[in-house]
């Protein structure tokens, strides 16, 4: 059974001689696809004839090419930037496929054998040099593999033509070629009659496939077409695919809805095993070529690549512009060679699946009857595909977001956290985890400080007092976090006293919902702080966004001292690292619990309190959340707080508070890592009651919210080397995750309150420097004016 080329011998294909006498050569690559540099003006494309015709003789006949220059001595792989050359940009197939992504990784096809079953190769050409494998041979009885038609040479060049900054180059310009000449002796020289043009017998093709298999070819290119494969060829294809070899077959150039009958072998799963790719042709505009057979019944196995106006030399080393699916096939074969070199452990099935899953979609969405799987795209093929994981583990890693710092860490800068990750095909990539760590989103301070339309209720029944804050909603009232108005400050003492009376003369107990243990402890001790909105004291909050859920406090008087034990459970409101989820909610709730013990003492007008707190965070570190890709960090903290307030007489009050924290953090997944994180916060204020009247009040406070101290961070043991031969991490390196910010938030706030018409007017003016401990943020200013009326 004889086969013919899927180029000029089919109805719509064309070959055009380039009007130049220079020898055709090769060149290097770039990242963003750009139109190739125009080739010298070609002669007009001849109108295709409706029936198969022999290979046309170029008109005018080409001037003999100059003697080829010697093959240059191989040199080390050039820097990535040098691949973006005029030669690369003139190579239409490489540009369309975005091959620069492969070249920049050092993937040139080096060491990969690709079989080319065709009409041989120009043995005098300098375009291939020593990269024609010695096992190359004719399987049809020809005395040599020297090409007589030009088709085989052009296909081989499109696949692996050298790169030398002249003309164009092959897509895998350093691959090794196993050339199998399969044209029947003398058939390529017949130019007239029904038997004109090269003919290829199935037995010759089958023998070539077997030789490709036994000589370790990873890929075999077959730019031929015709009737269905004979049994002898089917068996050879079966043997090749069983060995894991990928076969690329041209779709055919009849412009029909389905691939050529020969290429349809790809749909025979028992024989092809998914390793036969049908190559369709598109132009550089990603539109299917008019001559190309469409995907049709072979859509699942059909991949498109440039097959129009492909510049390549013929058997006499004269450059032509070739069109046909014969020239889209070697683009795909070359792409497979690039992948095989870059990722040596990939199987044939994986190579094919990568090209399919990474193809640019064209036509109807998904797999369609025109473009099949889509258009070859090496930028996407060389990028991680599917779920990425930390090398040496099954721990998932995001390419964009693995953690978000808390406000205590602000703008902590990373010097680089390079590690090795694997994609779903176990391909190794380097990833700088530092680029996947975000900073806490900054919220306007007044949003959280002002409670809106809230109503406060408090009542006492016997020795028990209850305080509730209700926020009216659309359908029902919801009980929110307890917030006592300034007028309720004295009532808070009543609550403490009431509870104390229930447990005896020296003990008091409190239990609450949506209220912090620290606040209830202060109530039991009878302490009330000035009503500042923004500048808070360290003991008023954890230092990061949180939502207390349940808390209990027990206080006992001991001869001038007060001892308070408090417990609390709640949720850290950690920023959502996923940008899509962040748009919906912005926060994720991560559990915490804390236990505090406080010792207080009053000395005339001076009240003091010393508190020790243990905080355990289930999935966070001082409010920061690190996903599995950063070890799923867990933390336990100890805080020591010291606070004092002096009633200086004449209505004057002076207060100060300081917190020091030590957080012990460790990773739980993927790799080992730990660290000690220091933190601190402070506040100082001065105020006076009775400025202009006997009942107004004024105060000023400066405060630093919780901030991680200099030098704090985590030491992570990250995988740094991956050995493909063993499929394992060969080395881990210690790298520092810095958590100390450069910014330092300082809050300055003034307050004034005055009674008016049975209520209270309260004014707060504040300035926040380096909000959220981020040095680059503009200072935050705000003014709040409130009027509250008691009932």
What feature does the model see in each segment?
Residues 442-645:
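Outer membrane beta-barrel translocator domains of Type V secretion systems
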Residues 528-541, 564, 576-589, 596, ...:
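Outer membrane beta-barrel transmembrane domains
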């Amino acid at each position: 059974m004889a086969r013919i080329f899927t180029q000029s011998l089919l109805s719509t294909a064309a070959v055009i001689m380039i009007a130049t006498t220079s020898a055709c050569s090769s060149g290097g690559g770039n990242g963003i696809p750009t139109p190739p540099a125009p080739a010298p003006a070609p002669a007009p494309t001849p109108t295709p004839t409706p029936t198969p015709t022999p290979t046309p003789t170029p008109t005018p006949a080409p001037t003999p090419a100059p003697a080829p220059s010697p093959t240059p001595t191989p040199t080390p792989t050039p820097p990535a930037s040098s691949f973006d050359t005029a030669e690369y940009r003139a190579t239409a197939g490489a540009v369309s496929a975005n091959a620069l992504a492969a070249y920049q990784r050092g993937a040139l096809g080096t060491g990969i054998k690709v079989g080319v079953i065709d009409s041989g190769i120009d043995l005098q050409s300098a375009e291939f040099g020593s990269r024609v494998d010695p096992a190359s041979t004719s399987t049809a009885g020809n005395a040599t593999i020297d090409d007589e038609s030009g088709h085989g040479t052009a296909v081989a060049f499109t696949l692996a033509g050298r790169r030398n900054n002249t003309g164009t180059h092959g897509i895998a310009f350093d691959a090794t070629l196993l050339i199998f000449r399969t044209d029947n002796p003398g058939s390529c020289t017949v130019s007239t009659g029904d038997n004109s043009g090269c003919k290829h017998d199935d037995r010759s093709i089958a023998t070539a496939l077997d030789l490709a298999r036994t000589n370790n070819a990873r890929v075999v290119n077959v730019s031929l077409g015709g009737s269905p494969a004979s049994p002898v060829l089917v068996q050879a294809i079966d043997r090749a695919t069983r060995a894991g070899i990928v076969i690329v077959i041209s779709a055919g150039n009849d412009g029909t809805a389905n691939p050529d009958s020969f290429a349809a072998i790809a749909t025979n799963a028992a024989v092809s095993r998914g390793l036969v790719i049908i190559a369709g042709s598109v132009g550089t505009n990603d539109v299917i070529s008019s001559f190309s057979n469409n995907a049709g019944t072979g859509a699942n196995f059909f991949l498109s690549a440039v097959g129009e106006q492909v510049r390549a030399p013929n058997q006499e080393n004269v450059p032509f512009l070739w069109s046909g699916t014969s020239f889209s096939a070697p683009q795909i074969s070359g792409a497979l060679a690039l992948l095989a070199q870059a990722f040596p452990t990939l199987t044939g099935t994986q190579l094919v699946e990568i090209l399919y899953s990474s193809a640019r979609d064209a036509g109807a969405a998904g797999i369609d009857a025109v473009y099949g799987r889509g258009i070859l795209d090496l930028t996407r093929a060389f990028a991680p595909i599917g779920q990425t994981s930390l090398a040496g583990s099954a721990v998932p890693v995001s390419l964009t977001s693995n953690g978000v710092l808390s406000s205590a860490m602000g703008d902590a800068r990373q010097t680089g956290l390079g590690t090795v990750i694997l994609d779903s095909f176990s391909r190794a990539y380097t990833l700088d985890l530092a680029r996947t760590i975000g900073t806490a989103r900054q919220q306007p301070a007044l949003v959280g400080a002002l409670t809106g339309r809230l109503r406060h209720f408090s009542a006492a029944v016997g020795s028990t007092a209850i305080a509730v804050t209700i926020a009216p909603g659309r359908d029902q009232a919801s009980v929110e976090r307890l917030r006592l108005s300034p007028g309720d400050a004295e009532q808070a003492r009543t609550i403490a006293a009431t509870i104390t009376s229930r447990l005896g003369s020296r003990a008091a107990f409190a239990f609450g919902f949506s209220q912090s243990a620290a606040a209830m402890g202060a109530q039991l001790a009878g302490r009330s702080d000035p009503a500042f909105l923004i500048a808070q004291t360290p003991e008023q909050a954890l230092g990061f966004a949180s939502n207390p859920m349940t808390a209990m406090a027990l206080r006992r008087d001991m001869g001038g001292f007060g001892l308070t034990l408090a417990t609390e459970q709640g949720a850290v409101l950690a920023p959502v690292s996923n940008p899509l989820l962040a748009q919906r909610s912005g926060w994720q709730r991560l559990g915490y619990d804390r236990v505090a013990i406080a010792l207080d003492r009053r000395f005339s007008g001076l009240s003091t309190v010393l508190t020790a707190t243990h905080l355990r965070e289930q999935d966070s570190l001082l409010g920061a959340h690190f996903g599995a890709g950063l070890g799923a960090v867990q933390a336990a903290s100890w805080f020591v707080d010291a606070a004092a307030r002096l009633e200086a007489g004449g209505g004057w009050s002076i207060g100060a508070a300081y917190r020091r924290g030590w957080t012990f953090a460790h990773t739980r997944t993927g790799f080992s890592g730990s660290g000690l994180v220091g933190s601190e916060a402070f506040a100082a204020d001065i105020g006076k009651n009775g400025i202009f009247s006997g009942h107004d009040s004024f105060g000023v406070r400066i405060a630093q919210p919780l901030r991680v101290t200099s030098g704090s961070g985590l030491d992570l043991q990250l995988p740094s080397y991956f050995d493909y031969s063993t499929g394992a991490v060969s080395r881990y390196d210690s790298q520092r995750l810095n958590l100390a910010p450069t910014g330092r938030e300082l809050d300055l706030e003034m307050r004034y309150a005055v009674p008016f018409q049975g209520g209270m007017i309260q004014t707060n003016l504040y300035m926040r420097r380096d909000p959220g401990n981020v040095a680059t943020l503009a200072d935050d200013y705000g003014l709040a004016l409130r009027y509250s009326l008691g009932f």
